[in-house]
Structure formats: structure tokens, C-alpha cells
């Protein structure tokens, strides 16, 4: 799901930069891998990775990749509609809605994704592996699982007021 809308200001945040090496006959070949999260702070967020011999080039590639992989995040006011658990690889992430004014209670990579999505009040817990790429993927996976009350009611074939 790619979005082409340059009118909206998209913010980017570098989550991790890794120095990776490949051992070849002549020695070690050095490159850099970047993990970047982008979002418009208004319900759209994406992440991407890039690899190059120079850090700025790796970041540029990661930003390009992230803009191509943006998702819509359903929100209720300043928080998420319901609690969600997700995992990717060894990383497990728990996201819980929080009351208005609570702020973002999340660490590192999860915080970057949540803030750039525009979610202002949420509590999160990172369980298992703390590898940045897996945490970001688990968080995005969790945000993809979120559904608005209207969607849930439609799936169940009942009205929103009947949801308990």
C-alpha cells in the first residue's frame, strides 16, 4: 500500500545504523545498514531498511523504502482503539490504550514507530528479543491488527452500540 502525497510533511527518524562486514579474499568489505521509521504524525507510518558503503546513502535508501511501505493506523482520539499483542521473530510487543494526557510509555524502536504514527497516549511493553528491526516489525504488525469499533461491528454483523 504505497501513498503518493507530497503535500503532507513526512518526518523521518533513524532507529539504528549497523556496520556490517563481508569477508572477501582481499580482507573485509565494510558497509552500513540503516533502519528508518517515517510518519506524518497523523495516522500514517512506515519503516524501511537500506544498505550502502556510506551512512547517508544507506539512510536515503531506507527512507525511500519506508515511504513505499506506509500503513494507516486507526486511532480513537489520541490513543489506539484496543489492546494488541504482536510478535516478529523473537520480539514480542504489547500495546495498550492509555487515557488522554498519559503520553507515550514506550522504549526505543517502539517509541519511534508510535510517535511518528501520531499516537500521543499509549502504554507499551517490549518482551523477548530487543533487536531494533524485529521490535519495529512487531510494532507495525500490531498497528496493522488494530480495528475501529465500526469495522468490528460490521464483521460481527451487529451495531456499534451492541458491542460490549
From Swiss-Prot:
Keyword RNA-binding tagged: yes
Keywords: Ribonucleoprotein, Ribosomal protein, RNA-binding, rRNA-binding
Molecular function per GO: rRNA binding; structural constituent of ribosome
Origin: domain of life: Bacteria
Signal peptide residue numbers: none
Name of this chain's protein: Small ribosomal subunit protein uS5
Gene it is expressed from: rpsE
Function: With S4 and S12 plays an important role in translational accuracy.
Domain remark from Swiss-Prot or TrEMBL: The N-terminal domain interacts with the head of the 30S subunit; the C-terminal domain interacts with the body and contacts protein S4. The interaction surface between S4 and S5 is involved in control of translational fidelity.
Quaternary state and interactors: Part of the 30S ribosomal subunit. Contacts proteins S4 and S8.
Family the UniProt entry places it in: Belongs to the universal ribosomal protein uS5 family.
GO biological process: translation
Any Gene Ontology CC annotation: small ribosomal subunit
Pfam family, one: Ribosomal_S5
InterPro entries on file: Ribosomal_Su5_D2-typ_SF (IPR020568), Ribosomal_uS5 (IPR000851), Ribosomal_uS5_bac-type (IPR005712), Ribosomal_uS5_C (IPR005324), Ribosomal_uS5_N (IPR013810), Ribosomal_uS5_N_CS (IPR018192), Ribsml_uS5_D2-typ_fold_subgr (IPR014721)
Domain S5 DRBM, chain residue ranges per copy: 10-73
